[in-house]
A protein has these predicted regions:
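Loop/turn-to-beta-strand initiation segments
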Residues: 133-138, 163-169
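Short N-terminal helix/helix-N-cap motif within the alpha/beta-hydrolase-1
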Residues: 149-152, 334
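Conserved catalytic/switch belt of AAA+ P-loop NTPases
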Residues: 128, 153-167
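Residues immediately C-terminal
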Residues: 146-147, 161, 177
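Conserved adenine-binding aromatic site and its adjacent loop/helix in ATP-hydrolyzing domains
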Residues: 125, 157, 184
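Charged, glycine-rich active-site and insertion segments that engage polyanionic ligands
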Residues: 1-52, 59, 164-167, 172-361
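Clamp-loader machinery-focused feature within the broader ASCE/P-loop NTPase space
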Residues: 1-150
Length: 361
């Protein structure tokens, strides 16, 4: 959102914001691009621009009119933001009426990662009511791929026959997970990774040490860097991961959440394969990635990591799974060979036990 100083919090969004406001006139937009580049920030800023009472000639929000202040305070009566319950607190948005209804039904369960149908129904009703401040009504959906099938079909009906004054902004990082019919009703706005220099400068301004290392760790996604750091990752630990795996030391990795550990190991596996093929690594410094890996063992490790990724959100036996994955990675990175990996019964049992626990009864 544009603040009273007229500045965007994510500077790399400036050109996309300007282009979208000047050229995209559809009632529904689909912001799509890699995670961590600011889809949600752009979606809310577009809503702010459409609701602004003193927009510039380029339709940019002023940041200081009454409507802009209401958007900044997350209390504009003509703006509804649909988020999974699990993202409400991290992003600082209160529950909508639909979210409250859904939450009352499952108050004892952990926060949902889905956008529920109750929230979408509330948004549909909201869009059909006359604007309170005379501009338009705006519904933001993020991440749009988190709508379950019922919720998505409920929204589709409104996108096909939109109320005259309503506009919709769907933000996502996995557009292929959306219904094809929803994608066809929206005008696409592609978003790309920001220039590394700009993203590194932005991270430096937030006090991060060695931001270039952390930016590479996330594949160039600056907002993902902040999430990783909040969960205990720093540049020193990241650069140690190849050596930790090579030495079979999983202990320091336990300070990271399991999905992050699996993701880090997948990136190490990718980079090890690149180095073995004579290409440059993408995620880790070249000097940190071991050479002389066993390619067959690396393939088996990659398959184990893919299986682990499907269960990474579960907490059962997380420590055992991390240990087993690191041991399998050690054999791949040290060139011990596939046969040695298969003959190592302790890690094999650990992986089977972890898979058995995660698969449920």
């Amino acid at each position: 959102m544009v603040g009273p100083d007229g500045m965007l919090p994510l500077p790399w969004l400036e050109a996309t914001l300007r282009d979208t406001l000047l050229t995209r006139r559809a009632h529904a937009l689909l912001l799509q691009g890699p995670r961590g580049v600011g889809q949600f920030d752009l979606a809310v800023t577009l809503a702010q621009a459409w609701l602004c009472e003193a927009a510039s000639d380029a339709a940019r929000p002023c940041g200081h009119c009454a409507s802009c202040r209401l958007v900044l305070a997350r209390s504009h009566p003509d703006l509804m933001v649909l988020l999974p319950e699990a993202l409400r607190e991290p992003l600082g948005w209160n529950l909508s009426d639909g979210d409250e209804a859904a939450t009352d039904k499952a108050s004892k369960a952990k926060p949902s990662k889905e956008i529920r149908v109750e929230a979408v129904r509330a948004a549909v009703s909201f869009a059909q009511v006359t604007s309170a401040r005379g501009r338009c009504k705006v519904v933001v959906v993020h991440p749009a791929e988190r709508m379950n099938d019922i919720a998505a079909n409920t929204l589709l009906k409104t996108l096909e026959e939109p109320p005259g004054q309503a506009r919709f902004v769907l933000a996502c990082s996995e557009p292929e997970a959306l219904l094809a019919t929803i994608r066809s009703r929206c005008q696409a706005v592609p978003m790309r990774l920001p220039p590394a220099e700009l993203a590194t400068e932005w991270l430096t301004q937030r006090g991060l040490a060695e931001p270039a290392v952390l930016l590479a760790a996330t594949g160039g996604q600056p907002q993902e860097v902040l999430d990783w750091v909040a969960q205990g990752l720093d540049a020193v630990l990241w650069q140690r991961i190849p050596a930790l795996v090579r030495d079979g030391d999983h202990g320091p990795l336990t300070q990271m959440q399991l999905p992050r550990v699996v993701d880090a190991l997948q990136k190490l596996c990718h980079d090890a394969a690149c180095v073995a093929a004579g290409a440059a690594p993408r995620y880790f410094p070249a000097a940190a990635v071991p050479a002389g890996v066993d390619l067959l063992a690396l393939v088996e490790w990659s398959r184990e990591l893919d299986r682990a990724a499907r269960h990474a959100d579960h907490t059962w036996n997380a420590g055992l799974m991390v240990e087993a994955l690191v041991l399998r990675g050690q054999r791949a990175l040290t060139g011990a060979g596939v046969n040695a990996a298969r003959s190592a019964n302790p890690s094999g049992r650990a992986m089977r036990q972890g898979a058995s626990v995660n698969s449920g009864p």
